[in-house]
Amino acid sequence: MAVLSSADRASNEKKVKSSYFDLPPMEMSVAFPQATPASTFPPCTSDYYHFNDLLTPEEQAIRKKVRECMEKEVAPIMTEYWEKAEFPFHITPKLGAMGVAGGSIKGYGCPGLSITANAIATAEIARVDASCSTFILVHSSLGMLTIALCGSEAQKEKYLPSLAQLNTVACWALTEPDNGSDASGLGTTATKVEGGWKINGQKRWIGNSTFADLLIIFARNTTTNQINGFIVKKDAPGLKATKIPNKIGLRMVQNGDILLQNVFVPDEDRLPGVNSFQDTSKVLAVSRVMVAWQPIGISMGIYDMCHRYLKERKQFGAPLAAFQLNQQKLVQMLGNVQAMFLMGWRLCKLYETGQMTPGQASLGKAWISSKARETASLGRELLGGNGILADFLVAKAFCDLEPIYTYEGTYDINTLVTGREVTGIASFKPATRSRL
């Protein structure tokens, strides 16, 4: 077989390619003027049962502020950065100015929102872009909340004010390569040494980890065998965080692999309130509610996009909205959004009155994320060929829902949490083989 020289290969490629092969893509307004892309975000049309009336004036104001910021600052750029799998760091000050980082934490420069207001803000961010909502959720409802619930007074005063302004960013590292759903079996270790601790181990799928200023690391105390929590600073000797490539969902989120090799953490940065795996549950109880509101917001955005698209796009001489099949799918999506919102709202009220159980939170996250997948699938059908373009939101949202369906407890694990609560029987491990 003859081996072509570089010059010959270049010549052959030139012969194969057309004269217009390397031209840049058309602007969407030129290529497809028949419908408006998501860079100009559609108005909200999904609140069919007027759930906004259930919100307090404060909660309504937060919704309005976040919606305006996301539509103005994020919608025009999100497709570009999603495609590049990069986070738009230049908008971080804008996200900080929304005043939602820190959520329900009171004091220390945090907003002290109600759980409902925090949830509404989460949904409004996710309505436009799921990656931005995950960035905020990891930073606020996991990283900051762990310091607020489990940290010392000195740690709260030192770290929370800067985090609340998004001047610094946090991540939360629990998951490991060998321990996802079985997080309580984590293998990262913390060994007591003079003046502090030596951390060794590996974490995976950690959002914000490649650029976070503070990393909340959970490790097993080699003396007590219990789970402890630590605040690790970026660039600590022995710490390395590298980006996980080739994701198909939440592409703007910088998920990373974290390697810890004899990372020294001073005693002052050990979280005194984390002394067992159960202590992480105080944080996860709140974050799981917030995660349930992400697919609510995503589904709102999908519905809004499809509602506008069906009225703009014409086939057979009429808007797509004029056809019975399309109306049926659109109404099914609308019904899903109403039911999802109502379940999410009730979860918030149960939490605010101290009645919410882990099983209720798990059922909410599992059922809502499942209905969101159905909503995204219907939306993809309604948009036809444009349903596979990130420019029209639905394809992007379709992909972004997949990791959300999995993190903070897979659908199956969350059903087992609820199942344990309603039956009194834990079924996380294989049952003993029957002798029958």
From Swiss-Prot:
Tissue expression: Particularly abundant in etiolated cotyledons. Also present in flowers, roots and siliques, but not detected in green cotyledons, rosette leaves and stems.
UniProt motif (Microbody targeting signal) ranges: 434-436
Catalytic activity: a 2,3-saturated acyl-CoA + O2 = a (2E)-enoyl-CoA + H2O2; butanoyl-CoA + O2 = (2E)-butenoyl-CoA + H2O2; hexanoyl-CoA + O2 = (2E)-hexenoyl-CoA + H2O2
Keyword Lipid metabolism in annotation: yes
Annotated positions of the N-acetylalanine modification: A2
Activity sensitivity to pH: Optimum pH is 8.5-9.0.
Annotated binding of FAD, by residue: 172-175, 181, 207, 313-315, 324, 381, 385, 410-412, 428
Annotated binding of an acyl-CoA, by residue: S181, D182, A183, S184, R288, G409
Cofactor(s) annotated in UniProt: FAD
Enzyme category, top tier: oxidoreductase
Gene Ontology biological-process annotations: embryo development ending in seed dormancy; fatty acid beta-oxidation; short-chain fatty acid metabolic process
Compartment(s) of residence: Glyoxysome; Peroxisome
InterPro entries in the record: ACX4-like, Acyl-CoA_DH_CS, Acyl-CoA_Oxase/DH_mid-dom, Acyl-CoA_Oxase/DH_mid-dom_sf, AcylCo_DH-like_C, AcylCo_DH/oxidase_C, AcylCoA_DH/ox_N, AcylCoA_DH/ox_N_sf
UniProt GO molecular function: acyl-CoA dehydrogenase activity; acyl-CoA oxidase activity; flavin adenine dinucleotide binding; salicylic acid binding
EC code: 1.3.3.6
UniProt keyword list: Acetylation, FAD, Fatty acid metabolism, Flavoprotein, Glyoxysome, Lipid metabolism, Oxidoreductase, Peroxisome
GO cellular component: a single term: peroxisome
Factors inducing expression: Induced by dehydration and abscisic acid (ABA).
Record's subunit section: Homotetramer.
Family: Belongs to the acyl-CoA dehydrogenase family.
Role according to the record: Catalyzes the desaturation of short-chain acyl-CoAs to 2-trans-enoyl-CoAs. Active on butyryl-CoA (C4), hexanoyl-CoA (C6), and octanoyl-CoA (C8). Has no activity as acyl-CoA dehydrogenase or on crotonyl-CoA (an unsaturated C4:1 carbocyclic ester) or glutaryl-CoA (a dicarboxylic ester). Peroxisomal fatty acid beta-oxidation is essential for embryo development. Acts as a suppressor of transcriptional silencing. Required for nuclear histone acetylation and DNA demethylation at some endogenous genomic loci.
Name recorded for this polypeptide: Acyl-coenzyme A oxidase 4, peroxisomal
Protein source organism: Arabidopsis thaliana
